[in-house]
């Protein structure tokens, strides 16, 4: 995923896409071997979302939240997905979960919801 993000930041989107596709295969394998890990589901959600499959990404995020409802990464990224898919009220619900964490994820999502920042993901 890191390599894909790096390519993306340099505008090399085709290379980034290939890295995300490779990461997705590895994450699916990892999830089969060790299921029900919130972090793995977060990465699966992120990777599928980056590949443009928002519906699948949302499913992974929601599975992760069933395991760990206060997972900062999942709540932030799911909130971003909701903003991108024009479901602001759902994004605000994710923000509400993060409000007491005093964390970067809260600030990032708030800025995106408020329109002060564009999601980089």
Language model regions located:
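Register position in tetratricopeptide repeats
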Residues: 9, 50, 84-85, 112-119
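Start-of-helix register in tetratricopeptide repeats
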Residues: 39, 73, 105-108
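Structural marker of alpha-solenoid helical repeat scaffolds
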Residues: 33, 67, 98-101
